[in-house]
Amino acid sequence: MPARTWILTGSPENLAATRAHGFGVIGLKERRRRQALEIETGDRVIFYVTRVMAFAASARITGPLYEDRTPIWPGKAGNPDPYPWRFEAEPEWVLDEPAWIPAQTLVDALEHIRKWPREHWKLAFQGQLRQIGDADARLLCDRLAASTPVTAA
């Protein structure tokens, strides 16, 4: 089965925690176990940042699902979640905040968003995790790659 692409919705604080760990581990909320079981090595995860409403990074899953409750992500105040369903990962494209891709600029281009009325496009990113189709995956990856600074070796 070909690799799938998922959009992981999270706060700027959770993205910062993932970045601090080198995008080497991705965690899903307690109630996302069923979805976690669908994710496989080789799948891609694209990070959508709440409040800012932008795409910030992508990573590839490099290992199987495991459970770990060691705190990494801050989660919501008063409602802690250990994000216990975890995967080893490696970063593909990681943007600095000024280069994050505003989702608003892709409202008419992403098939996933078209499931909702245009004026309610933000509903497309409610909940922590969703799988997207190949066309959306290509578009987002192209935009992330084009926005990633190239560094000299």
Where are the model-predicted features located?
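Short, charged beta-turn/beta-strand-edge "cap" motif at the junction between a beta-strand
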Residues: Y48-A54
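Short, glycine/serine-rich, charged loops/turns that create anion-binding
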Residues: P12, V52, Y66
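Short beta-strand-centered aromatic/proline hotspots
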Residues: F55-P64
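Contiguous surface segments at macromolecular interaction interfaces
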Residues: M1-P12, H21, G27-R34, R69-A153
